[in-house]
Each structure stands twice: as C-alpha cells, then as structure tokens.
Amino acid sequence: MKKRLELLLSLILLISIMISGCATQDKTSSSQKNEADEATQKVTIRLSTWAGADEAKELQAILDKLNSQSNEYEIVQDSNPADYDTRITTQLAGSSGPDLFWVSAQRAAQFASKNVMLDITQRLAQSNKPVANISDYYETSLSPFKYKDSIYGLPWIEQPVVLYINKDLFDKTGVSYPDSSWNWDKFLDAAKKLTIDKNGKNASDASFDKENVTQWGFTLNGWPPVQIFVWQNGGDVISEDFSNSPIDSPEAEAAFKFYADLVNSPMVPSQQIIKDRGFDTMFKNQQVAMFMGGAADSLDTKVDFKCGVYELPCGPTGIKATLGDVLGMGINAKTKNADVAFEAFLDLTDAIHQWKVMPPRKSMANIDMMKKLHPDRADALQAIINSMEYARTYRYFENYPDWDNIFSTQLMDPIINSHADPSVLIPKVKPQLDAILKKAAK
C-alpha cells in the first residue's frame, strides 16, 4: 500500500513538472514572438505637405511604394494647402510637429535659423545614397537650405520659368517661333504682332484700336517676377554680400522701366481683365499668345492647341537669366526617430525627383533620362534643361519676408496696379529695403 502511494505521488509530481515545463516553454515562445514582432514593427513617420487633392493622390502612390519596400518606416501624409505656412510654423514651434515637412526656399532660411530643422550635414556626408550627394545638386537649389555652413534640408524641385507659346496663334499671324536670338526687342516685336483688336489689326499697325483688344501678345500681373528682367539686364535687387538693395543701379532701373512699360502697354491685358478672366486661364482660352510660367506648370499638356515651350528671351546685352523656383523638404529637429526619419527623408526626396519637373540634380539633367520619366513632355524638356544652367533664385535670408513685403507693397504693387513711375518710387523704397538688410546683419 505504501509503495502504491509513493508511486502515485511520483506520477503526480512528474505530471506537474511536465505541465510546468510546457507552460514555461509556451511563455518563452510567446515572449520571443513578441520581441520579434517589436523588432520588425515599422516606425510611423508623419509627413506634412501643402499638396492639393490631385497632387496628394499622386504622392500617396509614391508613399505606398516606398512603404512596401521599407522594413523601417511607414510614411503617413497629412496634406492640406490651407494656411500651410502658418500651420507648420505653429506645429514646429511646439511639440506636435510632423517628422518630415515640405518647405519653401523662403521659409527654409527662417526655420534653419530658429533651430526647428534638423542639421543633416553629417548624415548626408555619411550616406552612400546618390540622393545624398550634395555635389550633384545645382547650387541655386541647395543654397536656400544652407545656414552657417550647415545643411538643413534638400530641394525636391527647381522649376525654371520658361516661355509657353500658342503655336496656332503664331502661325495665324505669321510670327516666327522663338529661337536663341530672341532678346527683349524681338520679344516685344512678336508681342505687338500677336496683339489683335476687334478689326483684326495688330499693335504695330497705325490704325490699331487699343481700346478694343481681343487677343493679347503677353500677360503679367506681378508674375513673372521683375527680378528676372533685372538679372537679364545685369542688375540685382539684393547685393551678393547682403549689404544693400541696388535697385537704383542703371541696369535695375532700366529693367523696372521695361516691366512698367509692358504693364501699361496694349500688349498686356489690364489688371482688371486678368482678375476677371483668370491669369493662366486667358492663355488656356487662347486670349493670350505668350505666357511665362514654371516648368512644372505643364501648360503644354493642359491645352487644346499646339503649345510650345521655349527658353526666355535674353536681355539687351545677351545675358540669359530665369528664376528657378525651389521647393524642398526638412526634418523636424524634435523628431523622436531621427535616424529612421532621415532614411525616409532620403528615399522620399529621391522618389519626388523622379516625379517632378525639374529635379534639382545635375546627373538627372539629361534629355534621355527625362524623356523616360516624362514622355508626355518630350518636346518641352530640352528648353527646361537648358534653362537650369542659368536659373537663379532669390537671395533669401532670415528676414527676407520683411524685405519682400516692402518690395511688393511699396514698389511692385504701385507699378502694376497704379501705373506708378519706377523712377519716382525707387529712391523712396531703397532706404527701407537697405534698413531691413542692415538689421539682419546685426
């Protein structure tokens, strides 16, 4: 009896040990599985952009592809163009900002100076990804993201301003298409011949009726910016050393006069007509024959007539210059996942370079590559690529918005909307602009 009891107790003990071992093994396996899941769990990277509905949809397709290829991150976009600058500035000042965000060249200088953008200088130097090679970027596109010898972001587009023309209207009036010899004089001559009144007379005819124009040769409303014409004439609006605004130089004054004369000429619609009918809409509706717009505007793909894309006419002495409109992306200095955010930043920047016209990298500025990426714009790409070689950007600095506010409201608005004489305004406005620059230098 005693032996049977001992045997029973031994069996119970053995079963208990086996059950305990299984439970421990299950617990260990479960723990290992959880640890593996945590190791492979992606980091959520929040991205803020100003993209509208259509652009956000295209962007999402890019993000879906990147997210599927990455084991590290999952980029989630928050795209809303409404009050973007105000919203992102507020978010970055607090603790609710995104990990990545789109930023204009103008804002980049401000954000970098306020330490809200992550300094990525060393990270770029240590990366072997082609997109991180800063020597491949056009200097005009990279310079807005530099502050005190450090880099705080990368551009994902530099779209030069180009000349869109309605070839059908050129053909109808017998005007030759633009070529490399086009300067201000040839541009004006074409604009006159392309400006038609209700009687079919053009602006170069003595009997032309400027009060009853039905077709205009050109249009402007503050765009294209006057800086383009100042540069083409050998002038500038901010000196290279940021010490002053040389808008009173002979070269600059002549360019302001050229711009004002265009605004007041019959070749350009009145500002009221432009407001009523729509700026680029008038070009699309064949009421304007020539339009200066960004390369990414893609007007050549959005109209029902033969549309050509050309380089801008050069200045009187042959100087070629255009504006390179630069947009880019930065990393929030307060991101909790800087390493992963940087990798997502690089991958997304590279992907946008494949998407947008024109990528700001010299290695991508060749016609064969661009035709593969954008076959629908094959005829426009050479002029765009050529324009990149001499595209310039504004000289941004920390207080640039203050400078630009005075330049716009005190100088350009009166010229455009009130027919003011630039020679009268310039002596009054220059001291105000110089004061902003001197304040920034302190």
PLM feature segments, named:
Residues 105-162, 204-211, 308-310, 374-379, ...:
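Hinge/lid segment of periplasmic solute-binding proteins
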Residues 190-191, 241-273, 303, 312:
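Glycine-centered hinge/linker elements that transmit conformational signals in sensory
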Residues 147-156, 161, 185-245:
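Extracytoplasmic/periplasmic solute-binding protein
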Residues 65-137, 146, 171-174, 280-282, ...:
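Extracytoplasmic "Venus flytrap"/periplasmic binding protein-like
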Residues 90-91, 98-99, 130-169, 208, ...:
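A structural signal for short loop-to-beta-strand junctions that line the ligand-binding cleft
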